[in-house]
Regions:
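Short helix-capping segments at alpha-helix termini
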Residues: 52, 132-136, 164-165
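Acidic, glycine-rich active-site loops and adjacent beta-strand->loop/helix elements
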Residues: 82-84, 140, 144-152, 176-179, ...
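Active-site metal-coordination/substrate-binding segment of hydrolases
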Residues: 75-142
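A structural signal for short hydrophobic beta-strand segments in well-ordered beta-sheet cores
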Residues: 57, 67, 100-102, 265-268
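Short glycine/serine- and small hydrophobic-enriched flexible loop segments
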Residues: 27, 124-131, 217-223
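Midchain, well-structured core segments that form catalytic/ion-binding scaffolds
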Residues: 158-289
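N-terminal helical capping/dimerization or prosegment-like subdomains
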Residues: 2-88, 280-287
Length: 289
C-alpha cells in the first residue's frame, strides 16, 4: 500500500535542515573541484553522509561517492555530479568563487547551482526519507556524487553500472531545472569539425586560403539548424525529423515529449593565424558543436 504523503510535514522537515544544508553547500563550494580534482569535495561529502547516519557510505574506484539509506534490494538513485568547470578570469567574479557568499536568497560560488546545490539537497532528502518512513518497502535510496561529468559526461554512470554492478530501478538527476520537474533527458552528441587553409601575408590575402572564412560558413550553417524544418526542401532535417511520424513512426511520440533538439558551437581552436607577416604552416581551425 502506498503511504499517503504529508507535504506539510515534509516541508517542515526540510526547513528544519535549512541551516545544515546551507553550511554543507558552502563547505562543498570551498573545495575547488574541477574534473579529476574532486578528492577534497568527495571527502567532504563522505563525512557529511557519515555524520547523518547513512547506512553505508563508500567511494568507488573511479572516485564516485555513494551513500545508501534503507535495506531493500531495489535501488532508487539520486545523482549529482560534483565536479565543476574552472573559474575563468577571477576578475569577472563579484565575490570569491570559493567562499560560498550567502545572501537572503542565494548562495554564490562555483558549483552552487551546477551542481553541488543538488548534492546538498539529495544528501538531506535521503535522511528525511528514512527519518519519516518514506523509503518504499523493498527499496533503498542511493545518493551519488559523481565525478568527471564536465569532461567525460556519462563515464561516471557507465562505471557504476558496469564496474560497481549497480543497476537502479529509477534515477533522479538533480541537474538545475529552474525549480521544475523534468521527466526526460534527450542526451547530447559532440562533433568536431576541422578545416584547413594556407597562411599568407596580411597584405596579400589572395595568396592564401583563409580557413577562418571556411569555418565562418560552417558556423552559420550550424546556427541555422536550430530553425530548420522537415519538408522535402530541407537538406538536413535532423533536429526535427525525429518528431515526425513519417520519419520516426515508432518513437515520434517520445521524441515530441522531450521536445526539439538544439545545436550550438561551443569552442574554436586554431594552430596558426590565417594572415601573418610571413608564410607559416596551414592553419587548422577546429570547432566543437
Amino acid at each position: 500500500m502506498t503511504k499517503e504523503l504529508d507535504f506539510d510535514a515534509i516541508k517542515a522537515a526540510a526547513e528544519s535542515h535549512r541551516a545544515d544544508m546551507t553550511r554543507f553547500l558552502r563547505a562543498m563550494i570551498s573545495h575547488p573541484s574541477e574534473s579529476c580534482e574532486e578528492g577534497e569535495v568527495v571527502a567532504c561529502i563522505k563525512a557529511e553522509m557519515e555524520s547523518l547516519g547513512y547506512d553505508e557510505v563508500r567511494v568507488d574506484g573511479l572516485g564516485n561517492v555513494m551513500g545508501f539509506m534503507g535495506e531493500g534490494d531495489k535501488i532508487i538513485a539520486i545523482d549529482s555530479h560534483i565536479d565543476t568547470v574552472g573559474i575563468g578570469n577571477i576578475e569577472n567574479w563579484d565575490a570569491d568563487p570559493y567562499e560560498g557568499y550567502e545572501t537572503d536568497e542565494i548562495i554564490y560560488g562555483r558549483g552552487g547551482s551546477d551542481q553541488e546545490g543538488g548534492m546538498a539537497s539529495a544528501t538531506y532528502a535521503a535522511k528525511m526519507m528514512k527519518d519519516m518512513g518514506l523509503i518504499p518497502e523493498g527499496y533503498k535510496i542511493m545518493v551519488v556524487g559523481t565525478v568527471q561529468e564536465e569532461d567525460c559526461d556519462g563515464m561516471c554512470w557507465q562505471y557504476i553500472y558496469n564496474k560497481d554492478g549497480i543497476k537502479p530501478e529509477f534515477v533522479i538527476s538533480t541537474e538545475p531545472t529552474d525549480g521544475g520537474i523534468y521527466r526526460g533527458h534527450r542526451g547530447r552528441m559532440e562533433i568536431r569539425v576541422d578545416v584547413h587553409g594556407t597562411s599568407c601575408h596580411g597584405s596579400a590575402p589572395d595568396r592564401g586560403d583563409n580557413a577562418i572564412y571556411k569555418m565562418a560558413d560552417i558556423i552559420a550553417d550550424v546556427r541555422a539548424l536550430n530553425n530548420n524544418g522537415c519538408d522535402e526542401s530541407t537538406d538536413i532535417k535532423g533536429l526535427v525529423k525525429m518528431l515526425d511520424p513519417k520519419y520516426n513512426p515508432e518513437h515520434y511520440e517520445d521524441a515530441r515529449f522531450l521536445g526539439r533538439g538544439t545545436c550550438t558551437v561551443s569552442q574554436i581552436f586554431y594552430t596558426s593565424p590565417a594572415a601573418a607577416p610571413w608564410p607559416t604552416p596551414a592553419p587548422s581551425p577546429s570547432t566543437v558543436v
